Regions:
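Glycan-processing catalytic domains of CAZymes
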Residues: 1-183, 192-193
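Carbohydrate-binding surface patches
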Residues: 174-219
Length: 219
């Protein structure tokens, strides 16, 4: 057989799909960012979709992906992550703090998270898998997070310029460790942007984080 450069074939495939169904919305999965630039470069997809795995397991990897996608899509395409939480946990409930921290980071960085399928939260690339359940508290919290993302989507997802912001805790008794992005364990990490003339500051709570991986593998 002949060697095939798969990312290059993405272009003709996507263009053929759009040509056949010009009235349909179109997206293609860049698994582990494979072919992301070629997919974005077609100008035929409605957003960029990244399924992230162990080779992109850290919160800083999410930041890197979003910056790259921003360039690939000429600052016009937004990013949705397929990121399966608590992947190695065999049964029980999702770990609520891990779920919400990952959501908070993704939203702050300008991305969003495909994490619900049908009537359940996704723990696997096999979407019907329901081995993990959402607690009632998590169900309530997720709705509030989505309400927040929807209400403030212009500030979260309209681009802007990243700013380095130094924060100082004025209450010495709190003894809080504050740092600017990238995140650190046992710290509150700030991430700031200037969006449409407004300064947007996110405070991401890593005070009790036991790792800097979004995956929270074992919950």
């Amino acid at each position: 057989g002949n060697k095939v450069n798969l990312p290059k074939t993405y272009v003709s495939f996507i263009e053929a799909m759009k040509g056949k169904h010009p009235d349909k919305r179109l997206v293609m999965n860049a698994v582990s960012s494979y072919g992301a630039s070629q997919i974005a470069g077609t100008g035929k997809v409605d957003f960029l979709y990244n399924e992230v795995w162990g080779d992109e397991a850290d919160f800083t990897d999410l930041y890197t992906i979003l910056k790259a996608n921003h360039q690939y899509g000429n600052q016009a395409l937004k990013t949705v992550f397929a990121a399966y939480m608590n992947y190695e946990k065999g049964s029980g409930e999702f770990n609520m703090p891990g779920i919400l921290l990952t959501a908070a980071v993704m939203f702050a960085l300008g991305g969003s998270h495909l994490e619900l399928g049908g009537d359940h939260m996704l723990c696997s690339e096999y979407f019907p898998n329901t081995r993990l359940q959402m607690s009632d508290a998590l169900k309530t919290a997720v709705v509030r997070y989505y309400d927040f993302m929807t209400a403030y989507q212009n500030l979260l997802r309209d681009g802007g310029e990243e700013e380095k912001l130094t924060l100082v805790c004025t209450d010495a008794s709190k003894n809080l460790n504050l740092n600017t992005w990238p995140p650190q364990k046992s710290a509150i990490t700030s991430f700031a942007r200037r969006v449409n003339g407004k300064q947007v500051v996110h405070l991401l709570n890593f005070l009790s984080a036991n790792s800097l991986s979004w995956r929270d593998l074992n919950g």
